[in-house]
């Protein structure tokens, strides 16, 4: 050993002999509890002094400076050691730990004591990113228990929760058998476990398909409701606009000035724009590849369902299973049909949205002329009393009407909220 450098082997021998240990009290803790080391072996490691003529170093070569709250961190966070035989509902093992495994041992601890780097020889470096993780802790389990590790912080587990749509929610799939568990089971037990797993998978499949059908039916109901409201509002707005056009023209109540004619939509132009909107949407529907694919998919599943229904061997079978060929074909056909109907309704909704936008634009143009300041008094006096009263009602309605909430906008917002 030189004056300024200790032999690496001597340093490692000292560290290995003095790293954290369990007391007799910790070993007496029952299997269901969690053993916790209340103190650290960090203070037990001897300081190997080296010569420092310039007095630059204030600590030994195998020590590192500690912060003021180091003692609190050691006792509070770094020394929880859950046994590997803990139940599934308990907390996950600490990060960057190594777990020794033994089939005959009663105590299995995950030590997270002192992390020693070969280069820096740093202690308890929690921020290192060496990718070290426990591989043996998830491969073996203690006898009579199953310990399922959760996802680490690098791969968060996404949990999607939804209300059950049927009285029997899907059952959680059991974990795979380990080699030790497989060797301890008979062939009959393995076959029984396989049948139970198939039954659970069939129930889960049936539940997922029914959930998807229910979601599509809910979306279709919302789309039908929107179309009903949009149809009623469009009819009312269109009748009001057409009635307003009857008061425009030479010698009539309202006269459009020549300089304002280029910005005003006349009745003939308005009708042409409505027809153009319908033609554009119809053309987009005919050229839609998505709609064509959904039609082919529906025909495919429908033919598969007809084939399964007419299968003589399946008719003679009295077994009623969740995942039978006929049941799968029926669910697939129903889902394909609902998706096709939903796509068709989307084009109708798009047509109503464009027509609603055009109606709102034209009504805003007409609204500014419906007042007595812009009206021709002589033309107004020539009108029958009923028409005069109706003109006054239109003036009040268009003047006092607040900007209405667009049905198309509210429908889009509700659709986005349901998808989220």
UniProtKB/Swiss-Prot annotation:
Presence of keyword Lyase: no
This protein's name: Uncharacterized protein T07A5.7
Which intervals of the chain form a coiled coil?
265-310, 345-374
Biased composition, class Polar residues, residue ranges: 85-103, 399-408
Query: What's the superkingdom here?
Result: Eukaryota
GO BP term, example: protein glycosylation
Cite the entry's keywords alphabetically: Coiled coil
Q: Where is the composition biased (Basic residues)?
A: 410-420
Q: Where is the composition biased (Basic and acidic residues)?
A: 184-199
Chain spans, region Disordered: 84-103, 122-211, 399-420
């Amino acid at each position: 050993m030189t004056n300024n450098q200790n032999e690496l082997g001597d340093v490692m021998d000292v560290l290995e002999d003095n790293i954290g240990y369990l007391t007799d009290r910790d070993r007496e803790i029952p299997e269901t509890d969690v053993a916790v080391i209340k103190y650290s072996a960090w203070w037990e490691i001897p300081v190997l002094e080296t010569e420092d003529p310039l007095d630059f170093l204030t600590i030994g070569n195998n020590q590192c400076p500690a912060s003021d709250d180091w003692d609190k961190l050691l006792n509070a966070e770094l020394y929880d050691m859950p046994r590997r035989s803990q139940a599934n509902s308990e907390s996950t093992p600490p990060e960057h730990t190594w777990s020794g495994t033994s089939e005959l041992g009663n105590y299995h601890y995950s030590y997270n004591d002192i992390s020693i780097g070969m280069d820096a020889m740093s202690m308890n470096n929690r921020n290192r990113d060496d990718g070290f993780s426990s591989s043996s802790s998830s491969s073996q389990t203690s006898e009579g228990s199953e310990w399922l590790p959760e996802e680490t912080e690098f791969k968060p587990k996404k949990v999607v929760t939804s209300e059950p749509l049927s009285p029997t929610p899907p059952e959680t799939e059991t974990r795979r058998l380990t080699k030790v568990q497989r060797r301890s089971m008979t062939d009959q037990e393995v076959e029984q476990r396989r049948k139970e797993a198939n039954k659970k998978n069939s129930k889960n499949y049936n539940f997922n398909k029914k959930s998807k059908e229910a979601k599509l039916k809910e979306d279709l109901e919302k789309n039908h409701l929107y179309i009903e409201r949009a149809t009623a509002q469009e009819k009312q707005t269109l009748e009001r606009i057409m009635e307003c056009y009857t008061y425009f023209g030479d010698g009539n109540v309202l006269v459009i000035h020549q300089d304002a004619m280029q910005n005003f939509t006349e009745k003939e132009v308005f009708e042409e724009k409505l027809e153009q909107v319908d033609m554009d949407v119809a053309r987009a529907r005919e050229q839609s590849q998505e709609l064509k694919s959904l039609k082919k998919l529906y025909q495919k599943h429908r033919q598969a369902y007809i084939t399964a229904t007419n299968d003589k061997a399946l008719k003679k079978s009295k077994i009623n299973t969740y995942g039978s060929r006929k049941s799968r074909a029926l669910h697939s056909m129903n889902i394909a049909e609902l998706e096709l109907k939903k796509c068709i309704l989307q084009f109708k909704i798009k047509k109503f949205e464009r027509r609603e936008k055009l109606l709102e634009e034209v009504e805003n143009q007409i609204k500014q002329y419906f007042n007595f300041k812009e009206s021709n008094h002589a033309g107004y006096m020539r009108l029958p009393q009923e028409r005069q009263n109706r003109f006054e009602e239109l003036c009040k309605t268009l003047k006092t009407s607040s900007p209405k909430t667009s049905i198309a906008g509210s429908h889009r917002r509700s659709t986005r909220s349901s998808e989220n």
